[in-house]
Amino acid sequence: SCLVGSEMCIRDSLNTAYDSSGISNLGNEAVTLSDTTLAVSVLNTLDGNTSGTVNANTVTTLTGSASDLITAYASGGISNLGNEAVSVSSGNASTSQANTLAAATSGVVTATLSDGDLSTLAGLTETGNAYSITITDTSVDAAALNTLDGKTTVAINASNITTLTGAAADLNTAYAANGSSITGLGNEAATLSDTTLAVSVLNTLDGNTSGAIDASNITTLIGAAADLNTAYASGGITGLANEAVTLSDTTLAVSVLNTLDGNTSGTIDAGTVTTLTGS
């Protein structure tokens, strides 16, 4: 049943009229809709009932399956679509389908994506849409995760990730988004690609994950001696011990310097130090 005069009643009445065996000589009429929110399956049925153009100018929201929505946008018999919000309310959408829908309307596309691997999801072409995404990869490049984070307004479920790889700064960016636009991070192992790194960035990363950080690619660490010793003392960072070190201190306790000297077999550049204190 429907409320007489309501949009649902008008819409249903159009298709009912076409289906009626008691009404003849319909089939080539132009149709002007009054709906604002419309199930796309109903629109496609109406499009099939008449060879005339269906004017969907009043529609502000289309709902339904991704395939049905794409069918409506591809139809030459439906006019004035292109700025409505789209909700994939039946089933999921593939990355390819999401791109097709996003290109078809300037409105926000809301959908749960069926793809979970970063290599496929990297193919998303637009931003500002409400895609629900669950990453299925266990090892993920942090820069790729951050790029994906910028393509959806819905928090990305990253709970399947067990290893993050890449530059420490990119990993810290991902962790900074955790709890807001990314969820499920906090205990991943990390494999760094940096060769030269500010130790403050490394220590921040160490605080962001309870997983082990593989820093074996690092050949030079830069920063304050105390911060460097903190990194070397951490049980959460592996692969350090032979890095060159460039200090940023100007005044330094010699005991701290000697501890640092014992932490790495690499050369310590103390060129910034103007004052040494201690016995």
PLM-predicted stretches and their roles:
Residues 63, 115-118, 165, 221-222:
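A short, surface-exposed interaction/processing loop segment used at functional sites
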Residues 38-39, 53, 93-94, 107-108, ...:
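Extracellular beta-strand scaffolds
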Residues 42, 96-97, 123-128, 138, ...:
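Intrinsically disordered, low-complexity regulatory segments
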Residues 2-10:
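Short, small-residue-biased leader/transition segments that mark boundaries at the very start
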